[in-house]
Structures are given as structure tokens and as C-alpha cells.
Design a protein with these regions (language model features):
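Mobile "lid/hinge" segments at catalytic clefts and subdomain interfaces of large enzymes
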Residues: 150-270
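Extended amphipathic alpha-helical scaffolds
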Residues: 10-56, 60-66, 241-302
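Structured core elements
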Residues: 15-19, 26-28, 40-43, 50-52, ...
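Glycine-rich, flexible beta-strand/loop modules in the N-terminal catalytic cores of phosphate-handling
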Residues: 36-120, 125, 132, 200, ...
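Conserved active-site and cofactor/substrate-binding residues in soluble primary-metabolism enzymes
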Residues: 94, 98-102, 116, 137, ...
Length: 302
């Protein structure tokens, strides 16, 4: 599909509403952020978050995967404007940074090894009600935005918060603020239908068996959300984008692996200064003796 076809695809509004674990959700694309590679408005209750994903067309010469995630909080989402002398929005809060990391952890492993195109994900709360927190749904929004734009992301991915009812002892998926007030567990778990990539937990001295049961239940909940996301993407019918993979020379790993025993011995030195000196000396020796001058000039000393 050409650029015009892709633009027409983004202009078609697609909405998928569903109920899971006693709460109402919605995924929507095609109306906002049409210039982005992919965009999704995800809603739980009356809380809405716009998540956009922009993927560069050209591969960058980085030695890492250049993925950036931002969670941009806006006062208007809770019906307020900034007070004081400065009326502009402030820098990202600590909470915003933590939410961005929550999105990064399940998203980053989903891209293929050697993928070097820049990817920028921005989650912006549009509306935040008094009961439904906007953080966990950002992961589903990021996953849906990437896949709706045809990015090479191995999704869907989702994130859930697991609480436990003080009255019935049953687990609660994405509990409201009121439900969390009496919960003795707050487990945040993210991943795909096949694996877990992030776990954060706080609890009031619950047993290991209960924590394991909560994690198992959370994985099942993630799988259910991924299934709903797949149904949404079937309506979007995205066109996969073309991309290239940076493949490293396999002989590099072989040359480095030949010195694993020496590196292991150096790391076992109890003296920190001596240990670091041995490691640096071994690295310099490997670079000098096992790599040509042309390779060092091309790849750098690191």
C-alpha cells in the first residue's frame, strides 16, 4: 500500500468496545493523530488516553534499539489549569516517568533483534475520572498503536493491575480507586499472551501461594486483553511496513567468546581496583589482537 492508501487507512475510524472482568473498555483509531505511524485512544470507564507511535522510515546507525516512551500528563485531563505564575505544563513528574517505564518494559522485547529504526511512543491522558487509573491501559494503547501502524512489533501486549477484594477474597482486574482502598494486594503485571515481561507488587503480608495465584490470574487476564486487541486489529487491517535488520558478523561473537574463561577469572578477583584493571586490560588485548585496524575504525573501540 502506498502513502495515499496508508493515509486513507488512518482516516477510517475504527472502534472496538468490550467488557472484561466487570469493567468496560474501548479501543479506537483513525480519528486522532493521523500524521503518526499509528495511534489509538484507549478507554476504561471515563478515563481516556491517546497513545501515538511514530516509527522512522530509515534505519539509524546505533548500537542499540532507539525506543523512546513518554507519558505526558496534562492538567486539563482532570479539569484543571496550572496555577501560580507559570501557566505552562511542568516537566514530567516522577509518576509520569514510572508510567513511561511501565510501557517500555513490555514493548521493547517485542521488536526483532537488530531493529534500529527510531520508535517514539507518546501517551497523553485526555480525560481522567476519579476512579479509573490511566497507567495500565497505556500499554494496550501503545501495542495497538504500533500494530495498527504496521510496525514490526510481536504483539499484542497488555498490562493489568491485580487487586483482591477484602470481602470475597477474589482477585480484581484493574481495580478502581475505591476498590484499591480495601485491597491487601497491588500487583502490576505486563506482557503478552505467552510470557510475562514485567512484575511490580506491593502487598500486606500475603502468602507466597496467594501471590503466585495472583500472577497466574494476571497472565490469564493479559491473554484476554490481547485477544480483544487482536479483534480490534482485525477491524483495522493494517499493512505491515518494510524494514531491514542490522545483522552482526557472527565471527565477532566467536572471537569474544574465546576469552570467556579469562574474563571469568578476572571477575572473580575480590579486590575491586585489581578486578577492574584486569577487565580493562583483557578488553584492550582482545580489541588489539583479535580485530583488524579496519574493524576497529568501523565499529569503534567499544
Amino acid at each position: 500500500m502506498g502513502q495515499a492508501g496508508r493515509e486513507r487507512q488512518h482516516m477510517t475510524k475504527v472502534t472496538h468496545e468490550f467488557d472484561l472482568f466487570g469493567k468496560h473498555y474501548a479501543l479506537e483509531s483513525g480519528e486522532l493523530a493521523k500524521q503518526a505511524t499509528g495511534a489509538c485512544v484507549v478507554r476504561q470507564g471515563d478515563s481516556e488516553v491517546l497513545v501515538t507511535a511514530v516509527v522512522s522510515k530509515e534505519r539509524k546507525d546505533f548500537d542499540f534499539f532507539p525506543l523512546t516512551v513518554d507519558f505526558i500528563e496534562k492538567m486539563y485531563a482532570v479539569g484543571r489549569i496550572p496555577g501560580g505564575y507559570l501557566k505552562r505544563e511542568a516537566k514530567p513528574s516522577d509518576h509520569g516517568t514510572l508510567v513511561a517505564r511501565m510501557v517500555d518494559r513490555p514493548i521493547r522485547p517485542g521488536f526483532p533483534d537488530g531493529y534500529k529504526n527510531e520508535v517514539h511512543i507518546v501517551a497523553t491522558p485526555l480525560v481522567i475520572d476519579e476512579e479509573h487509573l490511566p497507567d495500565t491501559i497505556c500499554v494496550a494503547g501503545a501495542s495497538a498503536a504500533l500494530l495498527a501502524g504496521g510496525a514490526p512489533f510481536d504483539g499484542p501486549a497488555a498490562c493489568v493491575r491485580i487487586g483482591r477484594s477484602a470481602e470475597t477474597g477474589e482477585f480484581i482486574v484493574n481495580p478502581t480507586v475505591t476498590e484499591m482502598e480495601t485491597s491487601d494486594l497491588e500487583l502490576t503485571i505486563a506482557g503478552t499472551a505467552d510470557y510475562i515481561s514485567m512484575v511490580e507488587a506491593g502487598a500486606d503480608e500475603i502468602s507466597e501461594e496467594d501471590m503466585l495465584a495472583a500472577m497466574t490470574f494476571g497472565q490469564e487476564a493479559i491473554a484476554a486483553f490481547c485477544e480483544k486487541q487482536s479483534a480490534f486489529l482485525a477491524k483495522v487491517n493494517p499493512t505491515p511496513m518494510t524494514y531491514t535488520i542490522h545483522a552482526a558478523d557472527p565471527s565477532v561473537a566467536e572471537r569474544v567468546d574465546a576469552h570467556l574463561a579469562e574474563m571469568s577469572a578476572a571477575l572473580k578477583d575480590a579486590d575491586k581496583a585489581a578486578r577492574m584493571g584486569k577487565v580493562e586490560q583483557l578488553k584492550a588485548s582482545i580489541i588489539e589482537n583479535d580485530f583488524t585496524e579496519e574493524e576497529r575504525a568501523t565499529w569503534g573501540s567499544d
